[in-house]
């Protein structure tokens, strides 16, 4: 983090100089244009277009040329100073960041199978972002064959999202109505919130839309049980149509943030319906890598400095715990209290009859004959009674 602050400080200096240089350049050139324009007008008025210049005017023109030359040289000198500031940013980046991160990479990630998976993840990310042309180009260059059925849902979702961003609700409403049963099954309130926003957009039209708003309120009927209070608030706002909702106690209904919220809700519920995560795997992996990389580089340097390279053998475990934040928590992790090892698919957590949990490897090492004594309580039990648990 300190490295980022250092580079950012240098960058702010450059941006400040750019701003000052731009203002200085603009002011200097405007003064020159006004000066030369006034001089030209004075010469034409005094001597005409074809008359010879007097000695005084020749001297004035010489001074004008010198002023122009001095201004240009001053601007060029200031521009060179900016170049040196820009180069300092590059030096700060080189000094504070490690340009070679291959030491913490895994060679296996560049094998054919891993490369194919990476390309698939990138294609899916571009589909999610609506960058269909880029995704198709990547498929052609990498030799991937993508079923059109994989692309179609993303095309539709991006079309609806683009409409929501410009406050057009009709495509999203049509999608929500057509998927109503599945949305209800996952306890989604998307359809109601879309109807609510449409009703609010009618309220913004004032008394002109009063009859249409009352007619549209019939769409709230299926949601009366779960959203009774919200519907009551919406109907109460009709009383203030004449004076304007913005001048009423219901002004909170016009909050612009709810349009950003509806985009997030639609993305979340639509992805859940398609069995997808809200964020693309590529963006999640990239964010996690940005957090973990500095810590991994530091621990790698310490390991090499202390000549204990065997501590990190580049397998599926790290020599230290890297905290990625709660945003990257997807499943619970169990560490066996006996062997002090994290459980895996091959060594899963096992629940004993007494309720205590240990790893399968610990279970196999602890039982004697047909009996197993729990390491935390005096209960004896059969190893076969232990059950695998899933978090």
From Swiss-Prot:
Protein biosynthesis in keyword set: no
Domain CTLH: start-end pairs: 153-210
List of residues that carry N-acetylmethionine: 1
Top-level taxon: Eukaryota
Any one GO BP annotation for this protein: proteasome-mediated ubiquitin-dependent protein catabolic process
Key words, A-Z: Acetylation, Cytoplasm, Metal-binding, Nucleus, Transferase, Ubl conjugation pathway, Zinc, Zinc-finger
Domain LisH: 114-146
PROSITE patterns in UniProt: CTLH (PS50897), LISH (PS50896), ZF_RING_GID (PS51867)
GO molecular function: ubiquitin protein ligase activity; ubiquitin-protein transferase activity; zinc ion binding
Keyword Chloroplast: no
A Pfam family per the record: zf-RING_UBOX
Chief place of localization: nucleus
Cellular component, GO, one term: cytoplasm
Protein localization: Nucleus, Nucleoplasm; Cytoplasm
Ranges annotated as RING-Gid-type zinc finger: 336-377
SS bond partners: none
Reaction(s) catalysed (UniProt annotation): S-ubiquitinyl-[E2 ubiquitin-conjugating enzyme]-L-cysteine + [acceptor protein]-L-lysine = [E2 ubiquitin-conjugating enzyme]-L-cysteine + N(6)-ubiquitinyl-[acceptor protein]-L-lysine
Function of the protein: Core component of the CTLH E3 ubiquitin-protein ligase complex that selectively accepts ubiquitin from UBE2H and mediates ubiquitination and subsequent proteasomal degradation of the transcription factor HBP1. MAEA and RMND5A are both required for catalytic activity of the CTLH E3 ubiquitin-protein ligase complex. Catalytic activity of the complex is required for normal cell proliferation. The CTLH E3 ubiquitin-protein ligase complex is not required for the degradation of enzymes involved in gluconeogenesis, such as FBP1.
Protein name, entry field: E3 ubiquitin-protein transferase RMND5A
Species, as recorded: Homo sapiens
